[in-house]
From Swiss-Prot:
Pfam families xref list: HSP20
Keyword match Transit peptide: no
Descriptive protein name: Heat shock protein beta-8
Gene: Hspb8
Entry superkingdom: Eukaryota
Keyword tags: Chaperone, Cytoplasm, Methylation, Nucleus, Phosphoprotein, Stress response
Regions of compositional bias (Polar residues) in chain numbering: 178-196
Induction remarks: By progesterone.
Residues recorded with modification Asymmetric dimethylarginine: R71, R78
Compartments where located: Cytoplasm; Nucleus
Amino acid sequence: MADGQLPFPCSYPSRLRRDPFRDSPLSSRLLDDGFGMDPFPDDLTAPWPEWALPRLSSAWPGTLRSGMVPRGPPATARFGVPAEGRSPPPFPGEPWKVCVNVHSFKPEELMVKTKDGYVEVSGKHEEKQQEGGIVSKNFTKKIQLPAEVDPATVFASLSPEGLLIIEAPQVPPYSPFGESSFNNELPQDNQEVTCS
């Protein structure tokens, strides 16, 4: 075994350089499967900017990258439940309203305040255990106020079921100086009267 000899013959037939796509019997069918997607939805003979710009713009409703359809709004937005930390947009004329489940807290353990365009609801609850330990529950929830709501008008009430209802009326839309929905001028009669 001296001089680097091995007790068994060892040959490496795959040591030669080979192309795995050309040598394999499956290589001709490797790229045939479209995986359930259209190969290319548009004509690729167009110059680059003409076919790429629609795919790169956010407003383009077509397919993206080999037939992938752009995602719609999340399921929470489709079913009227706002995303976490966001308040639902108010409808014109209706007050803004959010409910927070605080059934395990007493009213004196809750605090509601507005700060920097957010409503912050926090609660702290402590229980003494018989074994000498203390169990405490703390939570803080921040909800962004819509632009149509004045933070000074926010008020909260606690329902018997343990729901904290936070409401605020919408600020009426303001019109620029000089523009209004009513006309200050008196109506003019089309009849001409000559005084003699």
